[in-house]
Structure formats: C-alpha cells, structure tokens
Amino acid sequence: MAIKFSKFVINSNGNDVIDITEKVKAAILKYGVYDALINIHAPFSSSSIGVFEYTPDTVEEFLNFSKKFIKTKNHHHIKSLIVGNSATVPFIGGEFELDRFQRILLLDFDDKKR
C-alpha cells in the first residue's frame, strides 16, 4: 500500500465555508491515483473539514445554528471540536463517492481573515 501526501493553502475571510472538493481532487490526480481512501485534514484548532450538502441554505442554516447555540469566548474552538478536523472519503475511478450535492468543505470558524 502506497501513501501519498499533498499539502495546499486555502485563504479565508474568517467565519467561512469553502468548497475544496476540486482542489483535493486535483491534488490526488497529480499522482495518477484513481482508486483510494482519501483523508483530508485541517491542522488548525479553529477550522474543520466537513462532508455535507453544499447549498446556500445549508451553509446559512449551519452558521446560524452554530452562532445561536455556541456562545462562548472560545466558540471557534468548540465548533471545530464538534465538526472535527478531518474526513475520509472514498475516491473511485477518479471521482469522490459523494451524494449529488455533497462537497468536501473547509469550515473556518475564526473571526479573523487568514
């Protein structure tokens, strides 16, 4: 079993949800890999990786929900803890095994631009 590693940087405006599906796919395909289990990881304590429906309504509902129910000084760390900082997604035949509207998302819960 071969292990490949790729790293890339995503700029965020803070308190943001960013679709990284195609960026992750490009990183995989550059190695000529078409079938694998892919692990995506966000190394920051205030960001997460999520795999869920990516529509304006879903994103807005999630952000509103998290603001309403997580009102602590360290809210960004708590949100990251709840969602998790990694996800594993099957990659078969050069495509992710995702539902029609599902995407791989970077969720940045920090209030600052980075």
Residue ranges: model-predicted function:
Residues 1-114:
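Active-site histidine-anchored catalytic micro-motif
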